[in-house]
Amino acid sequence: MILQQIYNIAIEMGVESDLRGKATVQKVLKQTKEKYQKLDKNKKQEFDIEKLTNPYSDTRILFDNKKPAKKILAGVDIGTGEMLLAKRLRCDTVVSHHPLGLALADLSDVMHLQAQVLAQYGVPINIAEGVLKERIEEVSRGIAPINHNRTVDSAKLLNINLICIHTPCDNLAADFLDEYIKAKKPETVGQIIKALKEIPEYNQAVKLKAGPRIFVGSEESSVGRIALTEITGGTEGAKEIYEKMAQAGLGTVIGMHLGEEHRKSAQEAHINVVIAGHMSSDSLGINLFLDELENRGLELITCSGIIRVKRK
């Protein structure tokens, strides 16, 4: 299998599991194409044409040596150390979950997904976009000085394929959890925690002292309407959004991780927050993707935080 095929599979699975729905994703792509067509010649040369077919700016082929992928090393975070490990293990391809290179530099662009998901939960789209605007700009500025291409340069020197797949995997996790939690019909926050711990990735994370936790609320707190708004969408959104979520009638948020300022804002808005866990949630989405690759005959080795669980 060539690297482009792995990339295409990731995008396809990401779109199919996108909480916004396939029609909304296709609409976003159509709008992107229309904007591109209106650009002048110079702007078109600067435009990232992958955005015409890939709605996830944090997912990209970073180095392709044009040789088939047969043995893959996959990890949540990939650096030069993991690239050298891949060389030692004779892997021809490395899959990073967290974005690298130009995918990291443009991470903030995928955060617009959050506003569209919030709108589906009842937060007016104009309010969601307005609240997130400043946070998206903040993330963009924060990422700007990072040495984005450090690991990509290592991949080139070692001549090992490198790809990062972020939001598609997070979409898979969010979609899985959305269906799972709806089926469980929890009435209290404690019941959400119990349900999450029945999922193998979270069950193993408990043993690593990194299992699901209540950040706001208590086990006895009623859940109200549940929103999975903080599993996918690039990175942590705006802390001001919790007040708007409460006004939209939401009672509980399930997320991967939560900063202290965000926690305080959720508490002030009386929104329960369940943090499922970062590496465990990443592992859930990655596993659903890796299962597909394994079913297609690729050999897989996991490292760097992945709790590997095979489902099919």
Task: Give the ranges of each region predicted by the language model.
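Non-catalytic interface/targeting segments
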Residues: 1-93, 99-267, 271-312
